[in-house]
A protein has these predicted regions:
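Short hydrophobic beta-strand element within catalytic cores of glycosyltransferases
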Residues: 148-152
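Carbohydrate-associated surface elements
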Residues: 17, 35
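A conserved, positively charged/aromatic
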Residues: 1-9
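A conserved mid-protein helix/loop that constitutes part of the nucleotide-sugar donor-binding site
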Residues: 49, 56-72, 89-95, 185
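Short alpha-helical segment that forms part of, or immediately flanks, the ligand-binding pocket
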Residues: 117, 135, 140-144, 159-160, ...
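Aromatic "clamp/platform" in nucleotide-sugar-dependent glycosyltransferases that forms part
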Residues: 112, 131
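A charged, aromatic-enriched C-terminal amphipathic alpha-helix characteristic of glycosyltransferases
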Residues: 199-215
């Protein structure tokens, strides 16, 4: 039987990481990342006391990691809020986690927004906690609005979009099943650092907007 590679004229992947998963004998491999239609005319002033995230509320998006990390943010910066936009089968579990951690009114889950761009413009940073991604287009959409992004270096996408400490923060991807491991401290620490340093938010956010132009 012929393999997929042998049957195909070419293999097109969204990321270099995914491309490497294919048979090395495949001679015609191309990487064509997703893109955004245009760079929005507006840029977030990054002054709102609000972080944002968006995506399907499913296990692979691992919003539980983000919510658990926010508990550590809340202890230092109780005035800040985390708004998550999305729907999915994990919604009830996540709402229960929010309540159990005493974060009701602090971490809020909203339905998918028809104007996510405006939500980005009304926020100061974007968070991604996925266990894996097909690409991570939402990162580029947030960066195009001038938001510094904090994401785990999961397969695949974030590591090929974010330049660590230049236009965002790329976190090591530790134990993917844990909610209390070192990974939560790294996300919380990074969020707290951006909250405490508006000039760093501005620097990373401006660089993020420029980086988004690659796509």
């Amino acid at each position: 039987f012929l393999t997929i590679e042998e049957k195909s004229d070419a293999i097109v992947s969204l990321t270099e990481g995914d491309s490497k998963e294919w048979n090395a004998d495949c001679k015609r491999k191309f990487v064509i990342p997703n893109s955004i239609p245009e760079i929005p005319p507006g840029t977030s002033p990054r002054t709102a006391q609000r972080a944002i995230s968006a995506g399907r509320l499913t296990k692979e998006k691992a919003f539980h990691r983000m919510i658990a990390a926010w508990m550590k943010v809340y202890r230092i910066h109780p005035e800040w809020q985390l708004d998550i936009y999305g729907e999915g089968e994990e919604k009830k579990v996540l709402l229960h986690t929010i309540k159990a951690l005493g974060l009701e009114g602090v971490v809020r889950i909203h339905p998918f927004s028809t104007d996510l761009e405006q939500e980005f413009l009304d926020s100061s940073m974007f968070l991604l906690s996925s266990l894996y991604e097909g690409f991570g287009l939402v990162l580029i959409e947030a960066m195009a609005c001038g938001l510094p992004c904090i994401a785990f270096d999961c397969p695949y996408g974030p590591g090929e979009i974010i330049h660590h400490n230049k236009d965002g923060v790329l976190l090591p991807d530790f134990d993917k099943l844990s909610t209390d491991a070192h990974e939560l401290w790294t996300m919380a620490w990074s969020v707290n650092k951006l909250i405490s340093n508006p000039s760093l938010r501005e620097k990373l956010g401006n660089a993020a907007r420029e980086n988004a132009k690659r796509f």
